[in-house]
Every structure is written in structure tokens, then in C-alpha cells.
Regions:
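ALDH superfamily catalytic-core signature
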Residues: 1-128, 191
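Conserved C-terminal structural/oligomerization subdomain of aldehyde/semialdehyde dehydrogenase
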Residues: 2, 111, 118-235
Length: 235
């Protein structure tokens, strides 16, 4: 029997350092978080921000959600289409109804009153590590934002969920980025980008985000058996 292989959903983590190009980072994170209404296994829906850049990032992401990201029926100009069905729309509403008192909804937070299952691009700031929206997969156009004080806390927060599919880190300090990438417990780490996939690199998560890999030579290995053959050439 061949072992099962699965790539499962997970809230993807983006860590923003204060020396990053914040405007470019937030523009990219918004696209990576909201495209396909956030219904992608690698969507950038969870953002952890260094304290000194926190207010700027919340403002920039909120601006993207309110005034830049287009919502409607899918076409080349629209990034956010409907969520999958009525049950999923109600599930998203439930998450927003249960936003804790210490958190702020800085953009969106409501369904769109039109035919279909549309949800406004949403930003929820000031969340804590144990909050439901951090520990659960929302699978909708909802980006959550947390604050960290130092690199160790950023890594602790990033890894402190049961999922581990993919993550990204945004900084001009490549040495720091590589150090954090090594510490992240995720099957993929992007640096100063998010979402691009290439056929020659493996894709698959750790922990509850699945088993095995697809893409690349590692993906082929999932469908092969290894056989050892030895011969005595002197016989």
C-alpha cells in the first residue's frame, strides 16, 4: 500500500521586518492574501510585524483592502471573487462576530450585499497568538496582523501554530532572512516575495499541513519504490 500524500490548507505566515520596503511588501502581501478571495492554500493571510513598523503596515494593508483590491465576478481586473458557498460565507461571518475585544477590524469585516457569496477584503489587527483567528484557517479574504518585539518572538509566533505549509519574510537584511528561514518550521519560505511556485522546487508542508511533496524530483519520489541490487563481478 502506498502512503497517502496530501497538501492541506494552512494560514500562511508573512513576517515583516522594519527595514523592509513596506509599501512594496504590503502591496504584494495584499495580492497574495486576497487573490481568489483568500481561498488558496498558500495565501498570505497572517502577517506578523516588527513593533516599530506595525502601525505603518496596518495602515498600508488597510489602504490596499479598502481602495486598491477589486471585488466582483472573476475577470482579469478583479482579484477577489466570491467565497465558495453560503456555508463558507456564514463561517467567515462567525469569525468576525467572534473578534476579541482587544482586536481591531481596520478594513472590511462585512459581507457584500449583492447576489453571490462575496466578502469585503478585511484586515484584523492587534490579535494575540492564542486567538481563534490566528490558530485557525479562515480561508477567505481576511488578513490578520500581529506585533512582535524581536526576532526570537517572531519565530516563536510564526511556528506557534499546528500548520506549516509556507511562509515569507520581508527584509533588506538577507543574512537575517536566511537565519529566520532556517528557524521557520514551514515546508516553504519565500524571501521578499510570496506565492511564486516553480516546477523544479518541491511543494508541501510540515505538521498538520500535509505529508509528502509535489513538484520537482522529490514529487516523483512519492510515486516510486527503491530497490537495492548487488552483484559480485568476480563470480
Amino acid at each position: 500500500m502506498h502512503p497517502a500524500k496530501a497538501v492541506l490548507i494552512a494560514p500562511l505566515t508573512s513576517v515583516a521586518i522594519d527595514d523592509a520596503n513596506l509599501e512594496a511588501a504590503c502591496e504584494w502581501i495584499a495580492v497574495a492574501g486576497y487573490f481568489n478571495a483568500g481561498q488558496d492554500c498558500t495565501a498570505a493571510t497572517r502577517v506578523i510585524v516588527e513593533a516599530s513598523a506595525y502601525d505603518d503596515v496596518v495602515a498600508l494593508l488597510s489602504e490596499q483592502a479598502k481602495n486598491v483590491i477589486k471585488v466582483g465576478m472573476p475577470n482579469e481586473d478583479v482579484l477577489v471573487g466570491p467565497v465558495n458557498n453560503a456555508n463558507q460565507l456564514a463561517r467567515v461571518q462567525g469569525f468576525l462576530d467572534r473578534v476579541p475585544a482587544h482586536a481591531r477590524v481596520t478594513a472590511g469585516g462585512t459581507a457584500i450585499k449583492r447576489p453571490g457569496y462575496f466578502w469585503n477584503p478585511t484586515v484584523v489587527a492587534d490579535l494575540k497568538q492564542d486567538d481563534e483567528m490566528i490558530q485557525s484557517e479562515i480561508f477567505a479574504p481576511v488578513i490578520t496582523v500581529q506585533k512582535f518585539s524581536d526576532e526570537a518572538q517572531a519565530v516563536k509566533y510564526a511556528n506557534g501554530v499546528k500548520y506549516g505549509l509556507a511562509s515569507s519574510v520581508w527584509t533588506k537584511d538577507h543574512g537575517r532572512a536566511m537565519r529566520m528561514a532556517k528557524a521557520f518550521d514551514f515546508g516553504c519560505v519565500w524571501i521578499n516575495t510570496h506565492i511564486p511556485m516553480v516546477a523544479e522546487m518541491p511543494h508541501g508542508g510540515f505538521k498538520h499541513s500535509g505529508t509528502g511533496k509535489d513538484l520537482s524530483a522529490y514529487g516523483f519520489e512519492e510515486y516510486t519504490r527503491i530497490k537495492h541490487v548487488m552483484t559480485n563481478l568476480n563470480a
